[in-house]
Curated annotation (Swiss-Prot):
Signal peptide from the UniProt entry: none
Lineage: superkingdom: Bacteria
Residues that bind GTP 1: 9-16, 56-60, 119-122
EngA-type G domain segment(s): 3-167, 212-387
Self-association state and partner proteins as the record states: Associates with the 50S ribosomal subunit.
The protein's name: GTPase Der
Pfam families: KH_dom-like, MMR_HSR1
Family: Belongs to the TRAFAC class TrmE-Era-EngA-EngB-Septin-like GTPase superfamily. EngA (Der) GTPase family.
Length: 483
């Protein structure tokens, strides 16, 4: 990606709607309440023939230095300093407010090139707001409707004019574009399109050099953002005593011992009964999307109050989604009798989460940076197991021995016949067993096979899928017709 744009402006002018439009997916929370976005997030974006990175930010707000709003503003100021140019968004329908004027001055002081974006220009009465926008001193406003996708060709042209063609087009694009003429009508579908979807890929064999996607989840205030900030070595995510500070799922790039990592911090996931606000419901849905984007999910538990009902519900959700879980017992620096507490936590992990027997769990202190290398070693090992593939020959040699030792029980006086097994997928490992009467197979025997697979082929701590089907015998039943 050749350049970076920061989308900034006062709260509730449509910054996240524009962000979603450019990246092609609903990655940022959008609601009518001001201050929905609290952290800055970076993602690949596309606007016709322009490919770049875009930063969505918290609304610029005046606030006391020690308040949550002040920390949000600091995040936005950091985004401006990181970007090559700024898309300063105003609400053309509402017109220019004192907050717009104040923070337009802050953007001017940064010295960064600016495109003044007049959003909601499709609304009745927006013309007056458009004219008022000239008083901000940021140049001619570019009218758009981020919600409806109107004005995107004009925005594209404004960005190119601002930064220049040499800056906005990467070298490979310059070679490709030598014989091309840009026409928005011809490529009108290319706003936010063709951004690589992390989950829309063929499942490959395990590759230790491939970037690893990790989501970090847990109850509110378990220390998720503190852990990521420690990993990154910067205050990238908001932290503080207020529960539920993180509302969006925020991604950040990291490298651990040469391995490229994409981290997803998520909103704290509360019990449904406590999710009162519409906004918080949106946040939980956003966290679910982050889990689906991830490969390994680190479940952050507060070691001082672990394994509450909500912790187990989160773990169960991750397992049902087929992701590879790893537990981080955070705030370990607050534990006194560590050896006894750790033994108790391991026992509870095995007892409360038997569906992923052997689940890896590591004590850490996100605030002090203790145990992070050990945690990551377990994350990488779990990811490797999650990608494991076993040959059909090995599976069936094992299955033959299992049946000889413990055959399936007889049902209604008829013994069930198990014929063969094959692995049909990885991520998580999935197997199919061919047998005579799948509907009659007791679930206890299915669990017996899964536990045997886990132990024999060394697959602790990951979900294992096993399904049953009848043998594909085209001549089945013909013998009865013979006379």
């Amino acid at each position: 990606m050749g350049f970076t744009l920061a989308i900034v402006g006062r709260p509730n002018v449509g910054k996240s709607t524009l962000f979603n439009r450019l990246v092609g997916r609903k990655l940022a929370l959008v609601d009518d309440l001001p201050g929905v976005t609290r952290d800055r997030r970076i993602h690949d974006a596309k606007l016709y023939d322009l490919k770049f990175q875009v930063i969505d930010t918290a609304g610029l707000e005046e606030a006391a230095n020690d308040s949550l709003e002040a920390r949000m503003r600091a995040q936005t100021e950091a985004a401006i300093s990181e970007a090559d140019a700024v898309l300063f968004v105003i609400d053309a329908k509402a017109g220019i407010t004192p907050a717009d004027s104040t923070f337009a001055e802050a953007v001017r002081r940064s010295g960064k090139p600016v495109v003044l974006v007049a959003n909601k220009a499709e609304a009745r009465g927006s013309e007056a707001g458009m004219y008022d926008a000239f008083q901000l001193g940021l140049g001619e406003p570019c009218p758009i409707s981020a919600e409806h996708g109107q004005g995107m060709p004009d925005l594209r042209d404004a960005i190119v004019e601002l930064l220049g063609e040499e800056r906005v087009f990467a070298e490979e694009r310059q070679e490709e574009a030598a014989d091309e003429v840009f026409t928005p009508a011809a490529v009108g579908a290319l706003v936010g399109d063709d951004i690589e979807d992390p989950d829309a890929e063929e499942i490959p064999a395990y590759d230790a050099t491939k970037p690893l996607r990790i989501a970090i989840v847990g109850r509110p205030n378990a220390g998720k953002s503190t852990l990521i900030n420690t990993m990154l070595g910067e205050d990238r995510l908001l932290t503080g005593p207020e529960a539920g500070i993180t509302r969006d799922s925020i991604s950040a790039d990291w490298e651990w011992h040469g391995r490229k990592i994409k981290l997803f911090d998520t909103a704290g996931m509360r019990r449904k009964a406590r999710v009162q606000e519409k906004l918080e419901k949106l946040s939980v849905a956003d966290s679910l999307r982050a889990i689906r984007f991830a490969e390994v999910v680190i479940i952050v538990l507060d070691a001082t109050i672990p394994f509450e009902k909500q912790d187990l519900q989160i773990a169960d959700l991750i397992i049902r989604e087929g992701r590879a879980p790893v537990i981080a017992f955070n705030k370990w620096d607050l534990i006194e009798d560590r050896q006894m507490v750790l033994a108790d936590l391991y026992e509870k992990t095995a007892r409360l989460l038997p569906q992923v027997r052997g689940l890896r769990a590591v004590p850490i202190s996100g605030e002090r940076g203790q145990g992070i290398d050990k945690l990551m070693e377990n994350v990488v090992k779990t990811h490797e197991i999650w990608n494991r593939r076993i040959s059909t020959g090995r599976l069936n040699r094992w299955l033959e021995g299992v049946i000889a030792h413990q055959p399936p029980p007889a049902v209604s006086g008829r013994r069930l016949k198990v014929k063969y097994m094959t692995q049909v997928k990885t991520r998580p490992p999935g197997f199919v067993v061919s047998c005579s009467r799948p509907d009659a197979m007791p679930q206890s025997y299915v669990r017996y096979l899964i536990n045997g697979l886990r132990e024999t082929f060394d697959m602790p701590g990951v979900p294992i899928r096993l399904s049953l089907r009848t043998s594909d015998n085209p001549f089945a039943g013909r013998a009865k017709k013979k006379k």
